[in-house]
Amino acid sequence: MPELPEVEVTRQGIAPYLVDQTVVELIVRNASLRWPVPDLAHNIVGQTILSVRRRAKYLLIDTEAGITIVHLGMSGSLRILPRNTPVEKHDHIDLVLANGRMLRFNDPRRFGAWLWYELPEEAHPLLAKLGPEPLSEAFNPLQLLTALKGKKKAIKLCLMDNHIVVGVGNIYANEALFAAGIHPESEAGKIDIEKLTLLVVEVKQILAQAIKQGGTTLKDFTNADGKPGYFAQKLHVYGRGSKSCTHCGNLLSEIRLGQRTTVFCGLCQTK
C-alpha cells in the first residue's frame, strides 16, 4: 500500500503538470472503486487547477468550484500521459487537460478513491479528524506525549493511528521504532519524553529520506513517471524477519500486531 512518502512523491510528480491547467474532460471507465465515483466529480470539467496538495495519504486537487480527493488505496497509481494514450487494464479514470496531457488513475485492486467535495476539506468526513502531519512542527514530542497519555495500546499501533499522527504506515512505523530503539509492543502511555523525542526525530528523518529516495517499492508502487522508489534498499527491519539485525547481528523477530506484520530486534529495541 502506498504510504505517505509514496503519496508525496506522486504529488511532487504530477503537480507541475496540473497546476494552472484547465480540465476539459473527465473520463470514468469504472466507477466501482472503494467508494463509487460520484457524478459530481464531473464538476471539475471547465475548471482551472489551482494547486495539488497532500493531506495524510489523500491527494487534493484544488479548483475554485471544489476539491477532487484522490486516495491510491492498496495498488493505485497516477501517471501524466499524452492525451489519447491507449487504455490498459485497470486504467479507470482520465483527467484530460487542455494542453494535450492527462492524469490517468490505474488501480488493479480498486481500493482507491476518486471523490469530489465543495466545502473546505476540513469538514469532509475523511479529513475532519486527522492528526498532525508528521513532517510539520505540529508533530512534536510534547504533542505526542499528550496524545499518548493514559494509552495502554502498543506504541506501534498508536504510531499508525491517524488521529495521533497521519501517514505513518506499517513500513515506516517498523523502521522508526527500530531507529529509536523502542520495542513495538511497548505500552504507549508509559514511554518517557526522552524516548518520544527520539522517536519523533526518527519518524521525520525516515519519512524525509524515503521521499528523497522516491518512496518504497515492494510490489505495486511506481511514481508519476512510472519509476519505482528506492527506499526499500535502506530498510533495516521491515520485510527482514528472521534475518540478522543490521546493528547487532541478532536474528530479527517477526510477530503480528494489530493484524500487521511487525519486525523488530529484541536486543536493540527495549520495552
Curated annotation (Swiss-Prot):
GO biological process: base-excision repair
Keyword DNA-binding appears in the UniProt entry: yes
CDD domains listed in its UniProt record: EcFpg-like_N
Cross-referenced SMART domains: Fapy_DNA_glyco, H2TH
Assigned EC number: 3.2.2.23, 4.2.99.18
Ranges annotated as FPG-type zinc finger: 236-270
InterPro entries: DNA_glyclase/AP_lyase_DNA-bd, DNA_glyclase_Znf_dom_DNA_BS, Formamido-pyr_DNA_Glyclase, FPG_cat, MutM-like_N-ter, Ribosomal_uS13-like_H2TH, Znf_DNA_glyclase/AP_lyase, Znf_FPG/IleRS
Entry note: cofactor: Binds 1 zinc ion per subunit.
Annotated positions binding DNA: 90, 109, 151
Segments forming a coiled coil: none
Keyword Protein transport: no
GO molecular function annotation: 8-oxo-7,8-dihydroguanine DNA N-glycosylase activity; class I DNA-(apurinic or apyrimidinic site) endonuclease activity; damaged DNA binding; zinc ion binding
Active-site residues, Swiss-Prot/TrEMBL: 2-3, 57, 260
This protein's UniProt keywords: DNA damage, DNA repair, DNA-binding, Glycosidase, Hydrolase, Lyase, Metal-binding, Multifunctional enzyme, Zinc, Zinc-finger
The protein's required cofactors: Zn(2+)
Similarity annotation: Belongs to the FPG family.
Subunit and partners: Monomer.
Known function: Involved in base excision repair of DNA damaged by oxidation or by mutagenic agents. Acts as a DNA glycosylase that recognizes and removes damaged bases. Has a preference for oxidized purines, such as 7,8-dihydro-8-oxoguanine (8-oxoG). Has AP (apurinic/apyrimidinic) lyase activity and introduces nicks in the DNA strand. Cleaves the DNA backbone by beta-delta elimination to generate a single-strand break at the site of the removed base with both 3'- and 5'-phosphates.
Protein name from the UniProt record: Formamidopyrimidine-DNA glycosylase
Organism: Shewanella denitrificans (strain OS217 / ATCC BAA-1090 / DSM 15013)
Source lineage: Bacteria, Pseudomonadati, Pseudomonadota, Gammaproteobacteria, Alteromonadales
